[in-house]
Structures are given as C-alpha cells and as structure tokens.
C-alpha cells in the first residue's frame, strides 16, 4: 500500500456518521427516522441500510455508538469496519461505490411499463426485486453483535398483484426507496 498512489476513496470518511466505532466520519449521510419507518418491520433489507447502537462488526473492539446521530441510526452502506481498513488511511479506503444496480434497472423498467399503461407487465420486474430482497439473510455475516434482527416470515415482502396504475406507481416508488436506500 502506498498512500501516494490513489487506490481508494475518501467518500466513506465524509458520509459515515460521527462516533462510528473506530472511525470518525463527518456525518453528511445519516439515515432519517422517516426512512426507517418506510420499511416494513420484517424487511430484511433494514439490516443492510441501518446500523444501531450496540451493533459490532467482527474484528472491531467496540460496538456502534449512535450518540451523535440525529436519528439514532448510522448508514450501514457507507460504514467500513475497522478490520477492513487495515493498511489504509482515512483518505484511501478500499470501498465499492455503487453507481447502478440490477435492481435499479428492474425498478426503472417496471416504472416505465406502468407509466405507459401496462401495469400488469410491470409486476414481474417489481416482484423480482422483492423476491431477491425476501431471500436476504436478516442476520449480517459481517457483524458479531446485531441490535435489531428483522423477524422475517413466509409472508415477508409478498408479491405485488396491484394493477391500478396510480397505486402501483406509489408501490414502485416505495420499493425503490427501500431497495436503494442510502445509495447514490
């Protein structure tokens, strides 16, 4: 590792919340209570959007402390555990910045089909995203302590059957918010 060669990014340093274990961010990207409340309580994606006081990543010596977060949550997607920063300084962290995801393409296509009067054709694309989310492990393998584990059931994120164009538009927007939360 040579910090004089740009091999990483400093984005997590700016976006990560203040007082994250082993790392001080500027807190420019803090999830809100409104975003948290937009998720169904059993949605396993909650695990991969929010960190909460008491969460601890494997290899870290201290748990998350959300005392300085205005919402009480931190952004999971921008958190780089201390153990993954070995050999890096805060300005050159090895981190994958997601520019676009397949689920984003599926949701855009579902929205286009719905807006063009074909809500029935939009459903398979929307439900593909929900099916993948439904299969998400609610227990984060990167953490050895997890303060909140969604209680998933066989009824978690059921397929959408709504074909009313206006109602489906709202459903797609809500799905987009949950699926892509804290990205971009």
Give the label of every model feature segment:
Residues 1-6, 41-184:
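Acidic/polar-rich alpha-helix caps and helix-coil junctions
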Residues 1-39:
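Polar, glycine-rich mid-to-C-terminal structural blocks
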